[in-house]
């Protein structure tokens, strides 16, 4: 379950309870890692560019999946029954250490939403799949 990311080799796996060998993070952990590292890098670059006194950034992420009942008027099913909606929720908590004003802290949190991975996850995504021999 190794994968290449440029010159780097990563290991992804599932927990033993899911049939894996637990030799590495599962795919959702890798997704959260991408968002977390991108968030912290974006914040750090912004703070450096603006000369903010930011000593440390910590990003903690959690993923959960919920099912929301469909609205009564929403009826995409052929039999007229409304389909429930499965929603993936990513919870992100950012801890900023340093001598920042309340306004600077608020602006840094706004900048966090501008990291490229955040924009990809919240934007329109197309995934094109093809077979390769």
Q: Language-model segments: what does each one mean?
A:
Residues 1-33, 41-133:
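Extended beta-strand/beta-hairpin segments
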């Amino acid at each position: 379950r190794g994968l290449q990311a440029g010159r780097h080799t990563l290991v992804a796996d599932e927990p033993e309870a899911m049939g894996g060998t637990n030799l590495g993070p599962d795919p959702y952990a890798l997704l959260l890692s991408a968002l977390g590292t991108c968030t912290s890098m974006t914040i750090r670059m912004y703070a450096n560019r603006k000369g903010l006194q930011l000593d440390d950034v910590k990003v903690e992420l959690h993923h959960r999946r919920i099912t929301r009942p469909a609205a009564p008027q929403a009826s995409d099913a052929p039999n007229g029954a409304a389909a429930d909606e499965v929603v993936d929720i990513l919870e992100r908590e950012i801890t900023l250490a340093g001598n920042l004003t309340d306004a600077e802290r608020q602006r840094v949190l706004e900048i966090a939403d501008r990291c490229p991975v955040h924009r990809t996850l919240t934007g329109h995504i197309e995934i094109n799949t093809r077979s390769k021999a």
